[in-house]
């Protein structure tokens, strides 16, 4: 929320979303008021984009960067740099130590990894189906003699000479990191930790500085490929990202900050960039938007929310049901299966920068998945882009103001878009330029609408039970298109949609989370003594994980009494394949009555996620994992609340008209300045509401009104 420039303020919190296209910053002052900044991302040196975005936002408050940064108490970063490093396979040169005889399992991977992310037609075509190289090549993989079975019994003792030989080989091969992942070490880590100690001894003897990562220290969870991939990421991608985050933190310290940046983690909390488990920040960017939606929902009383985020490269969707996010425990990213707690999201490679091509054989239009990213499209002359993008279609159809992209910092050329679409799309299809561009947008909106519908209905819900939040820099441009006809209870576009993920970062607690796999199986009719044993096993795991959580906070200057602990567990009905994450109703578990409370909480959650009739307590229960979360609250942004005025927008909000093409005809769309609209104002389509950072399109057949929280409500008329 922008407040008068002369207002004395103390800036406290900075949220950052460094996306592939734009870098958003979100500043919060002592009153909870906030301002959003936006600038093009600078992948070569992220700090440059962050500083430019910060200066853009602070200009609205009449503050200098140095003045604001000196006041800041904390800052949260989210971005995609680590994920991009993994996707492009540009990580550190790592070595891998596994059981002898298992040296090939990493490069073989799980079968699903061979086709993750591919459309069906690409999977079966020899020229389009690529097999990504493993993170660690075979020649940097070594085996040691050792075997621990699935219940944790040492069947073959460790032959330490094989571990020393493996360590020396990898050190001699100039490995920049060494990863150790032995079978079933999550059940009994003794041998794996002994191998770790041997490797550390050999590294010290060599005089080199090589980090060593044992899976038992980082991800003591079942599923060998998932656990190994995730531990490798700590060396392969997290360590280089740690250096990037260090540079960003230092760049801001040189300009006045006195704190270390925190990073948005996959589970929805924030952790220090110095944290041991940094791989869990691999996909921090889109998570911020879901956290922001959850926080906004809590403040305003929305329980069921469909989160939709369109940026320059992707369309990300997540569901919040009854105020809770779903956490996946074994997600896939960059065509790898991983063992990370991840806010459940689905993503499509379709954003404002997505390239548009014609299939040379079928003449069908193909959108993405690759993107122009921060280079926008052909419309930006300096981009060097020659293939048309979605943004070029926006230009042709009159959606965007070529003189107001990023507030005029980037000048776009509509005629370049017209010429490129004519040559690449319109002429080959025998269409006019306008119809070709409109057809692309209709195809994109249809794809996104079907995707959103299937995600909601596939989980057994109806869109009528959900409020849809639309955000991201390109979200408000397409909101009408991908929500039309779905029947949402309400469709909401925040006025700060362009910086919504950064807003979510600013609203996220400082939180560490540790997980551990368990195998507790309890039939229905169980004596109290067995229930007590099960509760004790879970309690022991919680206590072990609590030490890890408190140690992380201690490194960041927080004592145990400042940390709020929240235990959790993963449970399923015996014989079923999928478990659910449950927040424990108890701080500790010791008695049979405690066990019954844990199963009652699971039954209630199961009925909410699926259906009450699907509950099957007669099968008994399995606890598959223990979870411990520790949280320290931070100042959060205040949701604005302004008095509502009349329905008619002030004349000062009108900034002219522009030709707008839809449904095979040109119309004159009324243009509005977003920040000049007042709460209570109602806008009928066709209209385009412009801000420096985003554009909200309201076509004919739709209307929107602005409430006192500066949220636009869109509905069909």
Curated annotation (Swiss-Prot):
Heterohexamer of two alpha, two beta and two gamma subunits. Its cofactor is Fe cation; Mg(2+); Zn(2+). One of its GO terms (cellular component) is cytosol. Belongs to the oxoprolinase family. The N-terminus is blocked. InterPro entries: ACX-like_C, ATPase_NBD, Hydant_A_N, Hydantoinase_A, Oxoprolinase-like. GO terms for molecular function: 5-oxoprolinase (ATP-hydrolyzing) activity; acetone carboxylase activity; ATP binding. This is Acetone carboxylase beta subunit. Catalyzes the carboxylation of acetone to form acetoacetate. Has a reduced activity on butanone, and no activity on 2-pentatone, 3-pentatone, 2-hexanone, chloroacetone, pyruvate, phosphoenolpyruvate, acetaldehyde, propionaldehyde and propylene oxide. The gene is acxA. Zn(2+). The heterohexamer contains tightly bound iron, manganese and zinc ions. It comes from the Bacteria. Pfam families: Hydant_A_C, Hydant_A_N, Hydantoinase_A. One of its GO terms (biological process) is glutathione metabolic process. It comes from Xanthobacter autotrophicus (strain ATCC BAA-1158 / Py2). Keywords: ATP-binding, Ligase, Nucleotide-binding. Its EC number is 6.4.1.6. It is an enzyme of class 6 (ligase). It catalyses: acetone + hydrogencarbonate + 2 ATP + 3 H2O = acetoacetate + 2 AMP + 4 phosphate + 4 H(+). The keyword ATP-binding applies. Optimum pH is 7.6.
């Amino acid at each position: 929320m922008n407040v008068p420039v002369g207002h004395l303020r103390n800036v406290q919190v900075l949220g950052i979303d460094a996306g592939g296209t734009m870098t958003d910053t979100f500043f919060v002052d002592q009153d909870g008021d906030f301002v959003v900044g936006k600038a093009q991302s600078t992948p070569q040196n992220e700090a440059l984009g962050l500083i430019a975005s910060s200066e853009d936002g602070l200009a609205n408050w009449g503050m200098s960067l140095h003045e604001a940064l000196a006041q800041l108490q904390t800052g949260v970063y989210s971005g995609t740099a680590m994920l991009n490093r993994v996707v492009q396979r540009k990580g550190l040169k790592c070595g891998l130590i596994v059981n002898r005889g298992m040296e090939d399992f990493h490069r073989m991977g799980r079968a699903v990894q061979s086709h993750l992310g591919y459309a069906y037609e690409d999977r079966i075509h020899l020229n389009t189906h690529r097999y990504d190289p493993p993170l660690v090549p075979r020649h940097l993989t070594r085996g040691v003699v050792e075997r621990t079975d699935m219940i944790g019994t040492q069947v073959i003792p460790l032959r330490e000479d094989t571990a020393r030989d493996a360590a020396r080989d990898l050190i001699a091969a100039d490995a920049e990191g060494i990863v150790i992942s032995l079978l079933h070490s999550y059940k009994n880590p003794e041998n794996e930790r002994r191998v770790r100690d041997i490797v550390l001894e050999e590294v010290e003897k060599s005089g080199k500085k090589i980090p060593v990562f044992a899976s038992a220290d980082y991800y003591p969870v079942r599923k060998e490929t998932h656990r190994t991939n995730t531990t490798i990421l700590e060396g392969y991608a997290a360590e280089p990202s740690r250096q990037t985050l260090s540079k960003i933190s230092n760049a801001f310290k040189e300009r006045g900050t006195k704190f270390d940046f925190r990073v948005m983690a996959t589970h929805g909390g924030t952790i220090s960039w110095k944290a041991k488990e940094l791989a869990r920040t691999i996909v921090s960017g889109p998570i911020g938007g879901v956290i922001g939606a959850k926080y906004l929902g809590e403040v305003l009383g929305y329980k069921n929310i469909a989160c939709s985020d369109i940026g320059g490269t992707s369309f990300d969707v997540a569901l919040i049901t009854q105020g809770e996010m779903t956490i996946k425990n074994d997600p896939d990213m960059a065509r790898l299966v991983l063992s990370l707690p991840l806010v459940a999201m689905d993503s499509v490679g379709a954003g404002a920068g997505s390239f548009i091509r014609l299939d040379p054989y079928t003449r069908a239009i193909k959108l993405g998945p690759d993107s122009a990213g921060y280079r926008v499209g052909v419309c930006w002359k300096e981009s060097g882009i020659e293939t048309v993008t979605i943004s070029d279609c926006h230009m042709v159809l009159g959606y965007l103001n070529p003189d107001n992209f990023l507030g005029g910092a980037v000048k776009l050329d509509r005629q370049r878009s017209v010429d490129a679409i004519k040559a690449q799309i319109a002429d080959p299809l025998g269409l006019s330029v306008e119809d070709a561009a409109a057809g692309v947008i209709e195809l994109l909106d249809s794809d996104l609408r079907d995707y959103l519908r299937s995600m909601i209905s596939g989980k057994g819900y109806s869109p009528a039970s959900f409020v849809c939040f639309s955000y991201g820099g390109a979200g408000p441009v397409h909101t009408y298109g991908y929500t039309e006809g779905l029947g949402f209870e309400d469709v909401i576009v925040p006025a700060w949609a362009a910086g919504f993920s950064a807003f979510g970062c600013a609203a996220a607690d400082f939180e560490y989370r540790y997980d551990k796999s368990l195998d507790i199986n309890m039939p229905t009719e169980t004596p109290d003594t067995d229930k007590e044993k099960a509760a004790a096993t879970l309690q022991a795991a919680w206590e072990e994980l609590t030490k890890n959580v408190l140690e992380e906070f201690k490194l960041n200057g927080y004592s145990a009494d400042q940390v709020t602990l929240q235990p959790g567990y993963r449970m399923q009905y015996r014989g079923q394949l999928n478990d659910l994450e449950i927040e424990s109703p108890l701080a500790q578990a010791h008695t049979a009555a405690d066990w019954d409370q844990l199963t009652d909480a699971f039954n209630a959650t199961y009925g909410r996620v699926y259906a009450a009739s699907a509950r099957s307590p007669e099968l008994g229960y399995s606890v598959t994992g223990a979870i411990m979360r520790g949280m320290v609250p931070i100042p959060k942004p205040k949701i604005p609340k302004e008095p509502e005025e009349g329905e008619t927008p002030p004349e000062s909000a009108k900034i002219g008209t522009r030709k707008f093409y839809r449904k095979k005809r040109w119309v004159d769309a009324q243009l509005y300045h977003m920040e000049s609209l007042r709460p209570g104002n109602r806008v009928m389509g066709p209209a385009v509401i412009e801000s420096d950072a985003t554009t909200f399109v309201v076509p004919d057949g739709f209307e929107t009104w602005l409430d006192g929280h500066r949220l636009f409500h869109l509905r069909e008329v």
